[in-house]
Amino acid sequence: MLTNDEILARVRETEAIRHGHFALTSGRHSDTYIQCARVLESPDVTAALAQEAVRRLDVEVDIVASPAVGGMLFGFAVALALHKRFVFTERVDGAMQLRRSFEIPRGARVLVVEDVVTTGGSVAEVVALVEAAGAEVVGVVALIDRKTERKF
């Protein structure tokens, strides 16, 4: 099991943490930015972080679902660590929907995985899709949680 300090060290080894002034896609501003793509370009670090996320789960999962594009790589890594099916959502004409041909069965236990959560908007949209399919969201995992007000 990795400690929080060990997790931070693994992220730092990818040189993903930046300091300065950043305008985030949420419209907010920050003096620190974590470029998740730098973390995700390292298969070893991504796998270690996904395995740690799985170790910390205390729920049964049938399917992992992530929003495209950001959450897809980490979501797949978590699904691989769980040995579970992976699906993703994508935005079409401004609306979030399941990728063509993906299905979430009624009653499935779904773990939603995202790379970075700032406002929670994308996660809330994925949660709504899962629930509309008659499935249950059993948890949300994020590689980076900016600890702001949630919508889910």
Task: Locate predicted features.
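Short glycine- and Lys/Arg-enriched binding-loop motifs that mark or flank ligand-binding interfaces
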Residues: 16, 23, 66-67, 103, ...
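Alpha-helical scaffold segments in soluble metabolic enzymes
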Residues: 6, 10, 52, 77, ...
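Conserved PRPP/pyrophosphate-binding segment of the phosphoribosyltransferase/PRPP-pathway fold
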Residues: 41-101
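Active-site-facing substrate-recognition patch
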Residues: 1-59
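Gly/Ser/Thr-rich beta-alpha loop segments that engage phosphate groups in nucleotides
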Residues: 22, 29, 72-73, 122-123
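PRPP/pyrophosphate-binding module of the type I phosphoribosyltransferase fold
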Residues: 91-152
